Amino acid sequence: MNNTHITLVASTVATKNVGRITQIIGPVLDASFPPGKMPNIYNALIIKGQNPAGQEINITCEVQQLLGDNKVRAVAMSATDGLMRGMEVTDTGAPLSVPVGESTLGRIFNVLGEPIDNLGPVDAATTLPIHRSAPAFTQLDTKLSIFETGIKVVDLLAPYRRGGKIGLFGGAGVGKTVLIMELINNIAKAHGGVSVFGGVGERTREGNDLYMEMKESKVINEENISESKVALVYGQMNEPPGARMRVGLTALTMAEYFRDINKQDVLLFIDNIFRFVQAGSEVSALLGRMPSAVGYQPTLSTEMGSLQERITSTKEGSITSIQAVYVPADDLTDPAPATTFAHLDATTVLSRGLAAKGIYPAVDPLDSTSTMLQPWIVGTEHYDTAQGVKQTLQRYKELQDIIAILGLDELSEEDRLVVARARKVERFLSQPFFVAEVFTGSPGKYVSLAETIKGFQMILAGELDHLPEQAFYLVGNINEATAKAATLS
């Protein structure tokens, strides 16, 4: 397939199907081609030349619409500064293609699959187009198993599925990126397969921090790049919407190759899937589409579906995907997060209220869900403990109004006990992170699932009623809580 693809590109460039720019509106441009030589939808167009200042221009665009009168409308993958009407546009005859395989490991790429880490060219002998169809139903794998993360609140209340799709939902500044970094730290380091990280429309500083951290932890091996276990694909906030709209597909294409050809288990991290939707909405109006609910593009569900349906596990290998989802104005009913919900196996919802209390990770134990939390999957002990924790926290939530008006003293003895245990549970759900050591000064903790279950069982059974609630705050397992209590008294 790859050879035919490469020869196809070579033959089309040889015959050179050339058009001219007729209109430029921001990141969207129109080009006219000779009759009978119209490029196909999703074909890559290349514009080369010089701008008025004499600087070289090399811009790749993707065809989005055929307008009639031999005109096409395309979205640019980089800034359109310096383009003029009448400039030549060359049709490559094929969709955007990016390098895949072992040569991508340890490197940083942009949306076009070009390395941007100043470490020289990448062997692009094997390339794949970024637009591909999802695997057939007959190819899909339906095995159910838990993916342990070492984070108590996640493993106990909303466990992740191996080969599943997980969403981290939260508004601005509640800790989505820190949580995704911790998951990379806990899972990618211990994970035998490869990881692909797609930075979609997020801060460049965070992308740089992640790269430096991966080099320090040897996930990216500087001495021997080929031994690295991760490929990074960035299309950050400063990029035009065309790049942010397609960079997720570039990362996914690299992950699919490891799954389908190398038959590996792959981790795919995307930060942030909302920016993919946002970029689509930015170009949607310029492409002449009528906006739909809240100003989003009318094709929102289709675009999301075409990306998410490709992120799946087949009989060849699995892709476990962890995606951060920004929630505009903390409104989970906004069309962007609401559309994402439908595709996920587990949702980890971050709460501003918990972040304000200083409970990190600020995961809302009552809002977060997982299809894996079934007694026949996780076992009755895990299931019963999780349900007990949720019931205790739910009762505490119901009692909060009474406490606010009348005070704790007006509660029955039984309710006071529930409140005391719920506050301990709430604090024990917090945990020091490895990636946050620099902020907190506390060393990070990885807590196994067995230790997590044991700790919460002891709190719910009342075995630790004599300990102060501060002892449970920002500790790992239950033994650390009892040790901390001894230092407090």
Curated annotation (Swiss-Prot):
GO terms for cellular component: chloroplast thylakoid membrane; mitochondrion; proton-transporting ATP synthase complex. Pfam families: ATP-synt_ab, ATP-synt_ab_N, ATP-synt_VA_C. The keyword Plastid applies. ATP binds at residues 170-177. It is a peripheral membrane protein. GO terms for molecular function: ATP binding; ATP hydrolysis activity; proton-transporting ATP synthase activity, rotational mechanism. SMART domains: AAA. It catalyses: ATP + H2O + 4 H(+)(in) = ADP + phosphate + 5 H(+)(out). Its EC number is 7.1.2.2. SUPFAM superfamilies: C-terminal domain of alpha and beta subunits of F1 ATP synthase, N-terminal domain of alpha and beta subunits of F1 ATP synthase, P-loop containing nucleoside triphosphate hydrolases. It is found in: Plastid, Chloroplast thylakoid membrane. GO terms for biological process: proton motive force-driven mitochondrial ATP synthesis. It comes from the Eukaryota. Produces ATP from ADP in the presence of a proton gradient across the membrane. The catalytic sites are hosted primarily by the beta subunits. F-type ATPases have 2 components, CF(1) - the catalytic core - and CF(0) - the membrane proton channel. CF(1) has five subunits: alpha(3), beta(3), gamma(1), delta(1), epsilon(1). CF(0) has four main subunits: a(1), b(1), b'(1) and c(9-12). Belongs to the ATPase alpha/beta chains family. This is ATP synthase subunit beta, chloroplastic. The lineage of its organism: Eukaryota, Viridiplantae, Streptophyta, Zygnematophyceae, Zygnematophycidae. The gene is atpB.
